[in-house]
Amino acid sequence: MRSMETISPSYGTSLLYYHFDEKSSVHLAETIRLAINQSVQRLIIVLLSPEFDHSQHEHLTSKWDWIQNILVLAYIAAAHVSQDRDDPLFDTDVILVRDSDQAAQHLAHERWDAVFTLEGVPAPKALVNASHDTVSLPAACHTQGSTIHPLKLVTREGKRKIYSVSALGGTFDYLHSGHKILISMGAWITTHRLIVGLSDDELLTRKANKQYIQPITKRTASVAAFVRMFKPSIECDAVAIQDVYGPTAWDPSVQALVVSSETLGGASTVAQLRSERSLPPMDLFVIDVISTSSVVLPERGTAALRDAKMSSTYIREWLARKEGSQEK
């Protein structure tokens, strides 16, 4: 195993293997920063905990807030590093597993060049072969001047419902951290099938820098591949939609709708249409990245969090600027 003190190579794709609990949660953001700084294109973050056992269906929704906090902590930490080095296309993926064997199942279709672990933690045999480098990261990482609170396991009270079929929607252009938080949470509560509606190309003609929008075939493939990696035990129906409703307008099997706080208004429109068509109501799950992240991230303020550049619009603007500078 190589130590950071002796060598600082750059790897195309790296994998961070991290045992997650309340104590280690305060070090996660800085550990992610160190791993990304040794990675060129992509970092796969494997977080391990017995609490991530998603086969216990009755506990999935009760852990909603805690799981959301974990994903926000990891993804926004990664987004800030990508922003600092002006690389919004750097790809970060987070998976939640109970052990290394389950991680290997989730990552069966993925490839990586190096495995990062904390000092004293051996790289798991299930994720390492002769072609991989293994790198040891400092076990106690703190960022000067930051306040990061431990993430305690908090569960929701009340009836623990099981959702066989859930739905969510969006453009999902250049699948970024914000998208992945939304999709991951939808997959987390789902036990059988996740429907992901993607705005068809015809709906995006008024978007800024529309020439850089990925075609619908690319976007649907990216979503399906991400769900397969995050939770391979469920089906993913990634489908093009021509309106804000998609399959929720006619599919009676949908039990839950997952939205962001920015698209909450559209959820009420969908609920009204289903009522008019005598379709079963859907339970609503809302993700609020800003309010959640302020609990666990360094105290950079709401404005700084909004500037984390987790948007497809920003990525297209970045691509346009990059192309413009190359033409000069």
Model-predicted segments: where are they?
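Nucleotidyltransferase catalytic core that binds NTPs
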Residues: 1-328
